[in-house]
Amino acid sequence: MQILLVEDDNTLFQELKKELEQWDFNVAGIEDFGKVMDTFESFNPEIVILDVQLPKYDGFYWCRKMREVSNVPILFLSSRDNPMDQVMSMELGADDYMQKPFYTNVLIAKLQAIYRRVYEFTAEEKRTLTWQDAIIDLSKDSIQKGDDTIFLSKTEMIILEILITKKNQIVSRDTIITALWDDEAFVSDNTLTVNVNRLRKKLSEISMDSAIETKVGKGYMAHE
């Protein structure tokens, strides 16, 4: 597994690199924190570990840049005790978030869970769903409508899959949150709202934002 570790604390970087390499992870770091995207594009990581507080530009800036060109899983690290950091990371499409200090074995477990969720599917099995006049590719986390294609985060795709498998039925927020926790995603009541809003924003790019309806006090419904 190729890991890009974007961490400016060299002591922490070396400690994490050593631990991760013992699990056969191939770890790359950043030499110039003004050119994170250069390393990202040349190394082509399978997962990015991204610190929030960095020199020159913060982790949120680099997450936006990565999301412009890739749907690679991103796990944020933060030493700040600020719940808004977690909300912001969700809004930007991160897959997980950990607050420093943390246990390295928990980080490794999260990385393995993300890898299983994103990459370990049977190559010849193409899982698709049809929704209205769009084709949803569950293995690629993409939605194609006509000539347009959008890409979702894993959390957004799980939410959408839950809703469209129960089309025209109200799905409670608790049901969605429970399913996401079962899938090892990190979602609270507040961040579920963030994810649904972000999902709608992406659907608006293919004129489908009205296909998911909020049922106040009850949950959400995907229309046929």
Swiss-Prot record:
Membrane-spanning intervals of the chain: none
Positions where Phosphothreonine occurs in the chain: 128, 130, 149
CDD domains in alphabetical order: REC_OmpR_NsrR-like (cd18159), trans_reg_C (cd00383)
Fill in the PTM field for this protein.
Answer: Phosphorylated by GraS. Phosphorylated by Stk1; phosphorylation increases the DNA-binding activity of GraR.
- Cellular compartment(s): Cytoplasm
Q: Which PROSITE patterns match?
A: OMPR_PHOB, RESPONSE_REGULATORY
SUPFAM superfamilies, A to Z: C-terminal effector domain of the bipartite response regulators, CheY-like
Q: Which GO terms describe its cellular component?
A: cytosol; protein-DNA complex
Q: Describe its function.
A: Member of the two-component regulatory system GraR/GraS involved in resistance against cationic antimicrobial peptides (CAMPs). Upon phosphorylation by GraS, functions as a transcription regulator by direct binding to promoter regions of target genes such as adhesins, exoproteins, transporters, toxins, and proteins involved in cell wall synthesis. Down-regulates the expression of many genes involved in RNA and amino acid synthesis or glycolysis.
Tell me the protein's name: Response regulator protein GraR
Write down the species: Staphylococcus aureus (strain bovine RF122 / ET3-1)
Q: What is the lineage of its organism?
A: Bacteria, Bacillati, Bacillota, Bacilli, Bacillales
Gene expressing this chain = graR
